[in-house]
Amino acid sequence: MKEATITPFAKPLYIMTKPVGAVCNLACDYCYYLEKSKLYEEQPRHVMSDELLEKFIKEYIQSQTMPQVLFTWHGGETLMRPLVFYKKALELQKKYAGGRTIDNCIQTNGTLLTDEWCEFFRENNFLVGISIDGPQEFHDEYRKNKMGQPSFYKVMKGINLLKKHGVEWNAMAVVNDYNADYPLDFYRFFRDELDCHYIQFTPIVERLSNRADGLRLSSLKQKDGELASFSITPEQWGNFLCTIFDEWVLN
């Protein structure tokens, strides 16, 4: 692959990398990845091999036309790949950097974080995104493990480890039918209890299908399917954002 030329007016190319595919230690009710395993039951191809990792890193860097390159690691649950995988990724980034500045961000549910993981993230300047749906009563409604056990306390333990090691982190929160009507409780938890400076809110709207293969969630093209019970309405989403905006401006 011919290496791209760095230009001052170019736009960056971003690719979200999923080194474990849909594999996760949680089974959140609203997750659109819960059914992905059925797509590769006969021939699993969802875990990135070392060969594919090197090919991807080399070609991704060479395709960039800007001096900064951002790698975004996403899941499934990213920390279900061992630490050695990400150490290998950094080695390959250095090998193919070609004078470019390389940055990394990673999204995780936070339940598998340890001191060792956090030390690695801090030493290598990773930005860590934590998936957490607000206070315990909101978070644990849908974000449970595969045995139906709540995950809030493990996530909080992970956040405290990030703070302990001085890792830069932010939050990604799903707005669903259970928490959408409590925007101030939601927002103040992140601001006052977590001291979180950056929050991404994601509204959940999913349609159901009655497919013969047992898959529940419908495609984007199917616009007349029944809404999943955890979905929010346009009115809820608008009120949620406006209420938080007013609180943010005033306080």
What are these model-predicted stretches?
Residues 146-153, 160, 164-251:
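Radical SAM enzyme [4Fe-4S]-AdoMet core and its adjacent flexible, acidic
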Residues 15, 69-71, 104-106, 128-130, ...:
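Hydrophobic faces of well-ordered beta-strands that scaffold small-molecule active sites
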Residues 55, 59-63, 92-95, 158-161, ...:
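A generic secondary-structure signal
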Residues 37-39, 76-80, 110-115, 127-148, ...:
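Conserved radical SAM core fold
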